[in-house]
Regions:
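N-terminal active-site segment of His-dependent metallophosphoesterases
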Residues: 1-59, 75-76, 132, 138-142
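Active-site neighborhood of phospho(di)ester-bond hydrolases with catalytic His/Asp-centered motifs
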Residues: 7-8, 35-40, 64-70, 112, ...
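Active-site environment of divalent metal-dependent phosphoester hydrolases
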Residues: 13-16, 43-48, 70-78, 115-120, ...
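Residues at alpha-helix caps and immediate loop-helix transition turns in enzyme cores, especially N-
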Residues: 16-20, 48-50, 129, 161, ...
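Extended active-site neighborhood of metal-dependent phosphoesterases/phosphodiesterases
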Residues: 51-132, 140, 175, 202-205, ...
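Short acidic, glycine-rich surface-loop motifs adjacent to enzyme active sites
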Residues: 141-157
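Conserved beta-sheet core of the metallophosphoesterase superfamily
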Residues: 161-235
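A short C-terminal boundary segment appended to hydrolase-like catalytic domains
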Residues: 231-267
Length: 267
């Protein structure tokens, strides 16, 4: 059964150094098919932070699909922000801003929602990006599980308002739902969340899962550090949350939920 280790908002520059080694060990134990990192590898897009992120990714023995977050775009270096906002990301992490991972049983498509503007960290998608991703999802053979990875979320927990949604979410969801998207992975809020798209978008016959990872940084905003592990088949998806245990200095399984594919989508 394909397995995904999903982490987000590592924020090298503000990473909790005690957590890095146990995190690597946890990923090793899970032995995922691939690792999804939904953005914000750095705190301020500095060279030293990208180098630390690169070293961390190089320690993972599994394929990695990573997309940029708003913190991976320079904030104070205005020349870089205006002229080449993804330059350092491409230099140290990867050239591709919207990578794809594909196997016989799943396809995962990354979408870059990080923007040089506005300055407050909001993200958005444009029609060209979404159409390209939708076409890739549609073209996948043998009806795999279809996954979309962004930094900014398509849905938010009840504690957050709609202003935190990814920009142009209605347009994007409509087209990605038509392409058969099953799972949306994101981060940004530093809050763990699992739900389904039918609550917000109400697209007939479509209900995908929205899965948000917490953070690995010291910017936990009241929540302990977490990662997600997804175990997927065409009819069943299990999502397990691993939470940092301060006393044991390990990540422990803290929550599991199972969803099944129905005629109306995933519930």
């Amino acid at each position: 059964m394909p397995t995904i280790a999903h982490l987000s908002d590592i924020h090298f520059g503000r990473v909790d150094s005690r957590i890095v080694e146990p995190l690597v060990q946890t990923i090793e134990a899970v032995a995922p098919t691939f690792v999804a990192v939904s953005g914000d590898l750095t705190q301020r897009a500095r060279r030293s932070q990208f180098l630390a992120a690169r070293q961390f990714l190089d320690r993972l023995r599994f394929p990695v699909l990573v997309v940029p977050g708003n913190h991976d775009v320079p904030l104070f270096n205005l020349a870089a922000r205006f002229i080449d906002p993804y330059g350092s990301y491409r230099r140290y992490i990867q050239k591709e801003l919207e990578p794809v991972y594909e196997s016989d049983e799943l396809i995962a498509v990354g979408l870059n929602s990080a923007r040089a503007f506005p300055f407050h960290g909001g993200g958005r998608l444009n029609e060209r990006q979404v159409d390209r991703a939708a076409a890739r999802l549609k073209s996948a053979p043998d009806d795999p599980v279809r996954i979309v990875v962004t930094h900014h979320p398509f849905d938010v927990p009840e504690t957050h308002g709609a202003e935190h949604l990814i920009g142009r979410s209605d347009m994007a969801m409509s087209r990605l739902a038509d392409a058969g998207a099953d799972v949306f992975l994101a981060g940004h809020l530093h809050v763990s969340h699992v739900g389904h798209t039918a609550t917000r978008y109400r697209i007939g016959g479509h209900s995908a899962l929205v899965v948000q990872a917490g953070t690995i940084s010291t910017r936990g905003r009241g929540e302990l550090n977490t990662i997600n592990v997804l175990r997927l088949s065409r009819t069943r998806i299990e999502i397990e949350r691993y939470t940092w245990d301060e006393s044991g200095h390990v990540f422990k399984s803290s929550w599991t939920r199972v969803f099944h594919r129905t005629a109306e989508g995933w519930f």
